[in-house]
């Protein structure tokens, strides 16, 4: 008798995706982050659902409702901090996942990569709107500053901003619509992640060597299911440690002050995972130029596959490209640090240099280095 998992219409989809899927035998722990992102998304949707049961999206009561969740709801504090720090874990996994793709040349699977870039934008939009919901000082001023950037768009800018606000400032209408979008977007992200997997399974996974692994495949279950479970346990260990020992480590103290349109905080800054993009935005004195640089800092990932000049897919056997990759990582860490600093000397010039280096590395230096490495192969 044929196994039910191979014949049942629903089970065979699961079977071909997670059980009998042929996977390369040599994929390292860097390939764990896809499943970790899936777990993060599930955690965020579940904790978010329970938070939404007690939250009110009204400017008068939003801040109080979050306080009520933390004080009066059974384990409300736990749900709230799991959700807030779950977002940080989500972005850590995202950045490592994208970094893995850049290092090992996974971007050569164009459809998978482009949907990944789209997913990155969707997750960033969701996180931004979620940060506005507690209606603290940084929520309000962060929303005001970032939405105001759209006014830099020629001709339609100011109308567009008022349309998004639903009035002449960030107010009740803005909060209500942000809550609605913040609730629906994770489900769109889940659907996109399904398409991401669909395209990935058309080609099969890449592997550290960047070479074809058709000659050496192993079944996903039990080898990679057990490996993924280890990754999930480590993720949960880090997340629970963060939530139970220092839940406010990655947050901003200003967000414990209720939103006040008449009082601007001394340093307006987003959550840590947006600081690199915020630093690039601030590095350009022109408003429109800054907005373009902000968008391009992520959109540049979509161009990477077309700038692949190497004869080899992965960086595993390319020492010069490896060095440049780690310079890029250091540059992004520098930008993250600068994004959290006040706009004064020497931080301004450091931010500008780091921003220029970021784009130069991806668009110019790395492709040229790959060409030089090609010549070294024939030398």
Swiss-Prot record:
GO CC annotations, alphabetized: mitochondrial inner membrane; respiratory chain complex III
Membrane topology reported for the UniProt record: Multi-pass membrane protein
Membrane-spanning parts: 33-53, 77-98, 113-133, 178-198, 226-246, 288-308, 320-340, 347-367
MF (Gene Ontology): metal ion binding; ubiquinol-cytochrome-c reductase activity
Pfam family, one: Cytochrom_B_C
GO biological process: mitochondrial electron transport, ubiquinol to cytochrome c
Top-level division of the source organism's lineage: Eukaryota
Keywords of this entry: Electron transport, Heme, Iron, Membrane, Metal-binding, Mitochondrion, Mitochondrion inner membrane, Respiratory chain, Transmembrane, Transmembrane helix, Transport, Ubiquinone
Subcellular location: Mitochondrion inner membrane
Function: Component of the ubiquinol-cytochrome c reductase complex (complex III or cytochrome b-c1 complex) that is part of the mitochondrial respiratory chain. The b-c1 complex mediates electron transfer from ubiquinol to cytochrome c. Contributes to the generation of a proton gradient across the mitochondrial membrane that is then used for ATP synthesis.
Assigned protein family: Belongs to the cytochrome b family.
Other known facts: Heme 1 (or BL or b562) is low-potential and absorbs at about 562 nm, and heme 2 (or BH or b566) is high-potential and absorbs at about 566 nm.
Designated name of the protein: Cytochrome b
Source organism of this protein record: Sorex roboratus
Gene that this polypeptide is encoded by: MT-CYB
